[in-house]
């Protein structure tokens, strides 16, 4: 296969992956994202939709008490969505490869922080969280498949 044909195939696959990823990402906000751990003899655990999780974690950015507790990881997870939107905006500028790559790395690190938070609190991830992560990774996979463009 010629280099140009391979490049076109990779570009098409990345575009399809990003579009599919964005659709899954948005869909995940309307699904149950996590719930509290059930305790024997206790009330039914609270279940949180993805949109509620996103809102609560982003709003808590402005709480100084949160930054000095174990819940600061929730604030970091709240910044995944704005960072992903910034990443999508930067896709409009092909020469901004390195800022996109740095954002992608930060997003992946914040995802790991979310999982640590789930273990500490403890929360149980549900289908909305799994699809949210899958959508994000489908969007970001293009960074692993592309080489930096020569300037």
Regions found by a protein language model. Give the residues of each.
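Compact integral membrane and secretory-pathway proteins
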Residues: 2-151
